[in-house]
C-alpha cells in the first residue's frame, strides 16, 4: 500500500495493463518464469555485469513466446463465442420442438397439478377431489375429464375449448365456468342432476335453446355473446340470476313468471321496458347502456331495490312517477341521461323517491331530503312560516306608519275573533249572525279570494272576489297579512280590511280555513280561535250534497278534513280557544253567543260549560270533566294572566340605559295622553283616525256634560239583549251592570311603572257643567269601586284553585268597549 501511495501512476498503469487481456497476463507470467530460469542457468557475474550476447538472445526468445501465447488466447476466445452461439440455437430449436409437440390436449399431469378440494363423493362412500381449476391453460381437448365423475366445481375459463361433451359424465357437477372460450352452442351435454351455476360469457353463442331439463339452474351468465332473443327459459323454475349483458337483444321477452331476483341486460339495443310485468321477485335490475327513453314498465315491482339505467335516453322528470311507488327502492343510477341536465333534477328525484339512499353513485344526505321536501311539498308549518316571511318582506314596500290596529296600551293587542272549520260547516253564517247581534263590538272582515262566487254570495259582503292577476299584484305590494291556498284557489286577509274595522273602534270577526290559522299564528296579532266542526260526518256530507255547489271530489276532501281539525285539536291542546259542534246551527250559535256574552261581560254569571248538549255526539272530542267545567273561566280569565306574564317578562328583564330612557319616554307620553295633554309637535306626524282607548283602573275624562250623556245613552243601547234590557234591582247594581264594560279593571295596572291620576272618573279640568254631573259621578265612582272589589275577589279565588302552569295558555286581550 505504501508503494502504491508513493507512486499512484505506477498503480494505475498496473491496473490498466491487467485489464488488457488474458494473453498479455500469460506473457507476463512466462516472462517472470524465464527470468527465474535464466538466473538459475547462468551464474551471476560479479558487480552485476552480464555479457551482451546472452542478453540479446534471451530478449528475442521472450518476445517470440509472448507473440505465440497471444495468438493462442485469441483463438480460444473465438472458439468460446462460437460455442455460445451454437448453444442458443440449440435451445431455441428445443423450445420450437416443444411447442410443436403441445397440441392443447389435457393430460393427467396437468390435472394432477390443478385439482383441489378433497372431500366426500356424492354418495358419501369415498373421499375424492371435488374442484378442478384449468383456467388460461390454452386447452382445446378436455376429453380426459370424462373419467372425473366426482367433480363438483369445474373452471375452464380462458381456453380454446369448443366442445363440452365431457360434462355429461359429471353427474354431481354444481358449478361450471366456461367463459372466454370458443363455444358456439351451450348446454350441448347431458344435464347434471344438480347443476346450479353456469357461466358461458365471452363466447360465440348466437342462439339460446330449450333449457327445460335444467330445472335446478339458479344462475345463468351469457354475457358478451351474439344472442338476439331470449328463449328457452320458461321452465327454469329455480332461475334467480340471469345476465345477458353485451348481446344484441332488442326486446325483453321470454321470461314469463320466473323467480328472477337479479337481471342484467346492459349493453344491448333495448328501447322499451317490457316483459317484466310478471317478475314479481325482481330485486336488482341493470338496463344500462341501452336506448331506453321511458321508465314505463317498472311499476308494481314491490321488491325492486336497485335500478341501473346509466347511459340511456331518459329526458323528462315526469318519468320518475313510474317508479314513485316502489316501496323499497334504495339505489338509482341515471348517469349520462338527458334528464340530468334539468336544473331541478337532483332534488326532484330525491323528493319523489324519499326512500333512496344512493342516487347516481352518490350517497344522499339527510339535509338534502329535508330541503327537497320543504321545496316541493312542505309541511303546513313550513308553508305558514314561508307565507309569513313573504308578507313581512313585501310589506316593507308600503309606507311605514303606526297602524290603526295598534292600541296605545302595551298589554292590549288588537282584538280579533277567528272562526275556523271545514268548508261550508256554517262558520260564515255564524260570523254574520254574531256581527249583526253584537254590531257595536264586532264587524265582519271579508277575505279576498280568486275563486268565483257561489250562488247567493255577494261581493264585499262574503268575500272580495278578485282575479289572480290582482291577487298577485296585492301580494307583491305587501297588502296581505296572510294568504293560503285551498281547493286550487287563493285566499288572503287584506290589512286594509283590518285597519278599516279598527279605525271605527271595532273588533274584527273573520272566518278562514286551518291553513290561514297557521299563518296568522306567526303574525303579531293574537286573536281568539274558535273551532266550528261538525261531529256527524254523514249529516255534514248530506248537507254538502244538497247545496249542489261542490263536486264529489270536493265533498270527499271537505269531509276528510273534519278528521284533520279534530286531530289538530287533540294533538295540540290549546291550539283553539273553544270548540263548538256545528251539527245544529241554532245550538251552535247559542253556544257561540253565550261565549261572547261572557267574554264581553254582558251576563251576570259565566256559562257553566261549552260542551254540546246531551243529544249531541261528542265522540270525536273527549276531554275531562274538570276541563269542561273550567273552559269558560279559562277562556275569560286567561287573557289577563297571559298578557300580564308577557308584560311582566318584558318589564322585569334587565335593560340598558338607552332602553330605560326609551321606556321612560313612552310612559311619559302615555301618562300625558291619559291626562288629556296635547302631544308635542313631532308626534303629530303619526296621527291616525279615532281608535277607542281601553279604560284603565276606571279612569275616564269627559270634556262636557254632553259627552257623559252620550256615553250613558250609548251604554243603554250596548246592553240591550234581543228580548229587552236586563231587570233593574237597585240603582247601584243597575249602574254596575250597565257600565261594567266601560270600567273594566286592568288586573296589573297597579304594577305598572307609572301611576294614573287619582279621582276616578271626573270631568276634564276647566270644563263647564261639572256641578251638573256630581250625582252621576258619585254613582259611577261607587260602581267602579264595587266592580274593582268584585274583580279582585274573582282573581284571588281563581288564583287559589289554579293549577301550576295553567297561566301560560295563549289567549286574547279584552275586546274594546264598542263604537265611540
From Swiss-Prot:
PROSITE patterns: GUANYLATE_KINASE_2 (PS50052), LRR (PS51450). Residues 337-375 form the LRRCT domain. Residues 84-94 have a biased composition (Acidic residues). It comes from Mus musculus. GO terms for biological process: axoneme assembly; cell differentiation; spermatogenesis. Pfam families: Guanylate_kin, LRR_1, LRR_9. It is found in: Cytoplasmic vesicle, Secretory vesicle, Acrosome; Cytoplasm, Cytoskeleton; Cytoplasm, Cytoskeleton, Cilium basal body. ATP binds at residues 421-428. Involved in multiple aspects of sperm assembly including acrosome attachment, shaping of the sperm head and in the early aspects of axoneme development. Not essential for primary cilium biogenesis. Residues 72-83 have a biased composition (Basic and acidic residues). InterPro entries: GK/Ca_channel_bsu, Guanylate_kin-like_dom, Leu-rich_rpt, LRR_dom_sf, P-loop_NTPase. GO terms for molecular function: ATP binding; kinase activity. Residues 811-820 have a biased composition (Pro residues). This is Leucine-rich repeat and guanylate kinase domain-containing protein. The lineage of its organism: Eukaryota, Metazoa, Chordata, Craniata, Vertebrata. Residues 414-597 form the Guanylate kinase-like domain. CDD domains: GMPK. One of its GO terms (cellular component) is manchette. Keywords: ATP-binding, Cell projection, Cytoplasm, Cytoplasmic vesicle, Cytoskeleton, Differentiation, Kinase, Leucine-rich repeat, Nucleotide-binding, Repeat, Spermatogenesis, Transferase. The keyword Nucleotide-binding applies. Residues 72-96, 800-820 are annotated as: Disordered. LRR repeats lie at residues 129-149, 150-171, 172-193, 194-215, 216-237, 238-259, 260-280, 281-302, 303-324. Highly expressed in the testis. During spermatid development is initially localized to a supra-nuclear region of round spermatids, and is particularly evident at the leading edge of the developing acrosome and acroplaxome. As maturation proceeded and nuclear elongation initiated, LRGUK moves distally to ultimately reside on the microtubules of the manchette. LRGUK is also evident in the sperm basal body and the sperm tail.
Amino acid at each position: 500500500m505504501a508503494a502504491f501511495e508513493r507512486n499512484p501512476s505506477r498503480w494505475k498503469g498496473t491496473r490498466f495493463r491487467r485489464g488488457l487481456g488474458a494473453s498479455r497476463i500469460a506473457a507476463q507470467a512466462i516472462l517472470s518464469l524465464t527470468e527465474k530460469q535464466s538466473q538459475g542457468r547462468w551464474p551471476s557475474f560479479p558487480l552485476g555485469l552480464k555479457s551482451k550476447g546472452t542478453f540479446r538472445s534471451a530478449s528475442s526468445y521472450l518476445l517470440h513466446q509472448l507473440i505465440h501465447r497471444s495468438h493462442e488466447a485469441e483463438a480460444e476466445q473465438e472458439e468460446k463465442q462460437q460455442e455460445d452461439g451454437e448453444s442458443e440455437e440449440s435451445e431455441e430449436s428445443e423450445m420450437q420442438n416443444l411447442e410443436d409437440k403441445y397440441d392443447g390436449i389435457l393430460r393427467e399431469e396437468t390435472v394432477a397439478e390443478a385439482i383441489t378440494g378433497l372431500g366426500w363423493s356424492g354418495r358419501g362412500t369415498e373421499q375424492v377431489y371435488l374442484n378442478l381449476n384449468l383456467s388460461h391453460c390454452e386447452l382445446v381437448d378436455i376429453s380426459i375429464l370424462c373419467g372425473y365423475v366426482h367433480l363438483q366445481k369445474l373452471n375452464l375459463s380462458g381456453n380454446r375449448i369448443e366442445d363440452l361433451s365431457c360434462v355429461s359424465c359429471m353427474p354431481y357437477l354444481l358449478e361450471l365456468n366456461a367463459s372466454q372460450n370458443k363455444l358456439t352452442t351451450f348446454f350441448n351435454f347431458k344435464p347434471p342432476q344438480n347443476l346450479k351455476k353456469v357461466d358461458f360469457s365471452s363466447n360465440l353463442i348466437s342462439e339460446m335453446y330449450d333449457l327445460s331439463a335444467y330445472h335446478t339452474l339458479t344462475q345463468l351468465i351469457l354475457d358478451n355473446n351474439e344472442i338476439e332473443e331470449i328463449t328457452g327459459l320458461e321452465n327454469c323454475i329455480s332461475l334467480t340470476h340471469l345476465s345477458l349483458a353485451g348481446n344484441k337483444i332488442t326486446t325483453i321477452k321470454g321470461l314469463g313468471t320466473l323467480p328472477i331476483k337479479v337481471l342484467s341486460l346492459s349493453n344491448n339495443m333495448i328501447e322499451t321496458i317490457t316483459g317484466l310485468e310478471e317478475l314479481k321477485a325482481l330485486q336488482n335490475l341493470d338496463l344500462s347502456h341501452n336506448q331506453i327513453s321511458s321508465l314505463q314498465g317498472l311499476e308494481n315491482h314491490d321488491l325492486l331495490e336497485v335500478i341501473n339505467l346509466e347511459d340511456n335516453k331518459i329526458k323528462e322528470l315526469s318519468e320518475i312517477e313510474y317508479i314513485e311507488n316502489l316501496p323499497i327502492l334504495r339505489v338509482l343510477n341515471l348517469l349520462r341521461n338527458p334528464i340530468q341536465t334539468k336544473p331541478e333534477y337532483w332534488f326532484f328525484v330525491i323528493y319523489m323517491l324519499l326512500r333512496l339512499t344512493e342516487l347516481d353513485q352518490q350517497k344522499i344526505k339527510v339535509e338534502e331530503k329535508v330541503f327537497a321536501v320543504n321545496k316541493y311539498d312542505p309541511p303546513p308549518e313550513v308553508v305558514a312560516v314561508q307565507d309569513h316571511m313573504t308578507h313581512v318582506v313585501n310589506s316593507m314596500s308600503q309606507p311605514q306608519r303606526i297602524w290603526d290596529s295598534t292600541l296605545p296600551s302595551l298589554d292590549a293587542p288588537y282584538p280579533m275573533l277567528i272562526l275556523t272549520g271545514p268548508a261550508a260547516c256554517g262558520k260564515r253564517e255564524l260570523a254574520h249572525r254574531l256581527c249583526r247581534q253584537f254590531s257595536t263590538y264586532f264587524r265582519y272582515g271579508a277575505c279576498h279570494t280568486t275563486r268565483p262566487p257561489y250562488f247567493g254570495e255577494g261581493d264585499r259582503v262574503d268575500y272580495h272576489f278578485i282575479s289572480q292577476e290582482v291577487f298577485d299584484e296585492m301580494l307583491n305590494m305587501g297588502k296581505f297579512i296572510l294568504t293560503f291556498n285551498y281547493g286550487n284557489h287563493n285566499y288572503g286577509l287584506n290589512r286594509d280590511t283590518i285597519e278599516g274595522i279598527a279605525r271605527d273602534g271595532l273588533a274584527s270577526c273573520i272566518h278562514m280555513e286551518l291553513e290561514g290559522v297557521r299563518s296568522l299564528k306567526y303574525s303579531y296579532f293574537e286573536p281568539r280561535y274558535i273551532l266550528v266542526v261538525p261531529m256527524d260526518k254523514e249529516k255534514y256530507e248530506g248537507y254538502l250534497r244538497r247545496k249542489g255547489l261542490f263536486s264529489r271530489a270536493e265533498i270527499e276532501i271537505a269531509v276528510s278534513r273534519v278528521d284533520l281539525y279534530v286531530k289538530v285539536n287533540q294533538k295540540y291542546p290549546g291550539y283553539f280557544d273553544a270548540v263548538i259542534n256545528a251539527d245544529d246551527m241554532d245550538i251552535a250559535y247559542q253556544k257561540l253567543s253565550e261565549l261572547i256574552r261572557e267574554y264581553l261581560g254582558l251576563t251576570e254569571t259565566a256559562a257553566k260549560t261549552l260542551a254540546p248538549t246531551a243529544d249531541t255526539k261528542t265522540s270525536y272530542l273527549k276531554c275531562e270533566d274538570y276541563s269542561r267545567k273550567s273552559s269558560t273561566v279559562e277562556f275569560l280569565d286567561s287573557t289577563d294572566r297571559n298578557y300580564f306574564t308577557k308584560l311582566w317578562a318584558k318589564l322585569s328583564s334587565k335593560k340598558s340605559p338607552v332602553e330605560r330612557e326609551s321606556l321612560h319616554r313612552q310612559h311619559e307620553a302615555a301618562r300625558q295622553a291619559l291626562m288629556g295633554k296635547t302631544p308635542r309637535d313631532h308626534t303629530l306626524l303619526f296621527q291616525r283616525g279615532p281608535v277607542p282607548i281601553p279604560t284603565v283602573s276606571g279612569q275616564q275624562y269627559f270634556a262636557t256634560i254632553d259627552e257623559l250623556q252620550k256615553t250613558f245613552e250609548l251604554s243603554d243601547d250596548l246592553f240591550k239583549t234581543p228580548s229587552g234590557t236586563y231587570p233593574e234591582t237597585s240603582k247601584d247594581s243597575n249602574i254596575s251592570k250597565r257600565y261594567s264594560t266601560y270600567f273594566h279593571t286592568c288586573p296589573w295596572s297597579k304594577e305598572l311603572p307609572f301611576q294614573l291620576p287619582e279621582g276616578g272618573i271626573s270631568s276634564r279640568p276647566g270644563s263647564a257643567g261639572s256641578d251638573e254631573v256630581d250625582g252621576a259621578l258619585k254613582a259611577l265612582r261607587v260602581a267602579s269601586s264595587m266592580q274593582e272589589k268584585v274583580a279582585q275577589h274573582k282573581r284571588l279565588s281563581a288564583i287559589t284553585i289554579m293549577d301550576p302552569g295553567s297561566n301560560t295558555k295563549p289567549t286574547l286581550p279584552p275586546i274594546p268597549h264598542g263604537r265611540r
